[in-house]
Regions:
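A short C-terminal helix-loop "cap" of Rossmann-like NAD(P)-dependent dehydrogenase/epimerase domains
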Residues: 51-54, 78-89, 115, 143-155, ...
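C-terminal "lid/loop" region of Rossmann-like NAD(P)-dependent oxidoreductases
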Residues: 92, 121-123, 132-137, 145-166, ...
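Hydrophobic alpha-helix immediately C-terminal to the catalytic Tyr-X-X-X-Lys motif of short-chain
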Residues: 39, 43, 47, 77, ...
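Hydrophobic "lid"/C-terminal helical patch
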Residues: 77, 81, 106-113, 137-140, ...
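Glycine/proline-rich active-site loop of Rossmann-fold NAD(P)-dependent oxidoreductases
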Residues: 38, 63-76, 83-86, 102-103, ...
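Generic structural signal for alpha-helix termini and adjacent loop/cap motifs
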Residues: 50, 80-84, 112-116, 177, ...
């Protein structure tokens, strides 16, 4: 059976009101991006309800890995370190994120598409764990250059009401109705990602000195 998988985002939940965040968690449009995704999810759901279109809303949490945009925090940290910088510029380091290696996210989409129990559902892809941005940065620093330190760059701070303070997703539903499971740990995923960025032909695509909005 053909299915329509709509890519949502954990950002639709906003700052967690409870954890782990399951699919029933209230939606909070804390940014224009999350607000538009909430709208897109609602339209997709309306097509399922009104026209029986075989729609599933897939909601991945924070995906990372090789080739990721420089706008994301992990490439931002890695590229600064590989450029030889010893002061790593970041925005807020207290928020938490639930981080998924890209292959696990992709496999989640595949398993959701294969399952006959997912039509009309909203499904998180998450690890059911969290780490602060600061602790994440320190993990990467310890691998590449333990002498580096984190400094706050005010330009990189989100507006206070827009910052998503905590993302910690529940993966109970996807584990129950599909054959998906997490195969790559955070530490393994970081190593694979750093290895990819460390290749000169890959690193040259990024400009560590430029803050990407």
């Amino acid at each position: 059976m053909e299915k329509v998988l709509v890519t949502s985002t954990s950002e639709v939940y906003g700052t967690a009101l409870y954890v782990p965040i399951d699919e029933k968690h209230p939606r909070q449009g804390q940014s224009p991006y999350s607000a538009t995704k909430i709208g897109a999810d609602a339209i997709a759901d309306s097509f399922y309800r009104s026209f029986n279109l075989p729609v599933t809303i897939v909601r991945p949490f924070n995906t990372f890995g090789p080739r990721q945009s420089a706008r994301a925090v992990i490439p931002t940290i890695i590229t600064q370190l590989l450029a030889g910088k010893t002061e790593i510029k970041l925005g807020a380091i207290h928020p938490t994120r639930d981080l998924l290696f890209v292959k696990d996210t992709a496999n989640g989409f595949v398993e959701i598409a294969k399952s006959d129990k997912t039509i009309g559902e909203e499904i998180n892809i998450a690890t059911s764990s969290e780490i602060t941005v600061g602790d994440l940065a320190q993990k990467i620093i310890n691998i590449i250059n333990p002498l580096a330190k984190i400094i706050t760059d005010d330009i990189r701070l989100r507006p206070e009401k827009s910052e998503v303070e905590r993302l910690f997703g529940s993966n109970k539903k996807i584990l129950e109705i599909t054959n998906w499971k997490q195969n790559v740990s955070l530490d393994e995923g970081l190593k694979l990602t750093i290895d990819w960025f460390s290749k000169p032909e890959n690193l040259q695509r990024y400009k560590a000195e430029i803050y990407n909005v």
